[in-house]
Regions:
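Acidic/histidine-rich helix-loop elements
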Residues: 22-23
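Outer membrane beta-barrel
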Residues: 1-17, 29-155
């Protein structure tokens, strides 16, 4: 996938992260004398590679394995758990699934994947949606999920970022 993006900022460019991701807390607001003109970015970083395996085991069950990655990560201070939980190239999903168990990294259990909007261009999620991929151990049955996930908290502007010593229980 190849992207060509032209941006014109009326209130200043704001945070460099905005050129790759939609993060509302980093958008420049208010009057600014910064007339930087337009910016053009072209890349193929949203191209994805996915490998899915389905291995039969005794009893008619199977073990499913998924490995998916892309290159959609910004270099520098932003290639961290807040954005991708990985580094260049960016690992999106890497998990094994057997019966009701899932072990690895995929969409957080706290996220409603069905609420994601259809979009040709990945700009992130709409405001108010929990969005993230976490390392986890998850058990699912009859519409109920129980998971132990990577503990990562980011609350912008109040200094409440934290890495806990115990996993998130969802």
């Amino acid at each position: 996938k190849v992207d060509g993006i032209y941006s014109d900022y009326s209130n200043g460019e704001g945070h460099p992260l905005n050129r790759d991701f939609y993060v509302p807390s980093t958008i420049a607001v208010g009057a600014s004398d910064d007339d930087i003109g337009g910016r053009f970015d072209g890349h193929a970083r949203q191209s994805r590679f996915r490998l899915t395996t389905n291995t039969p085991v005794d009893g008619g069950d199977s073990i499913t394995g998924v490995l998916e990655f892309d290159f959609m990560v910004t270099k520098g201070d932003y290639d961290n758990e807040r954005i991708s939980n990985s580094y260049l190239p960016r690992m999106r999903h890497a998990f094994l699934k057997y019966k009701n168990w899932l072990v690895g990294q995929t969409w957080t259990t706290f996220m409603d994947v069905g609420a994601l909007h259809e979009s040709l261009d990945f700009i992130g999620t709409t405001d108010g949606i929990t969005f993230g991929r976490q390392v986890m151990v998850r058990y699912s049955q009859n519409g109920f999920d129980f998971a132990l996930e990577n503990p990562e908290t980011t609350v912008v502007g109040v200094g409440a970022t934290d890495d806990n010593s115990v996993p998130d229980v969802i």
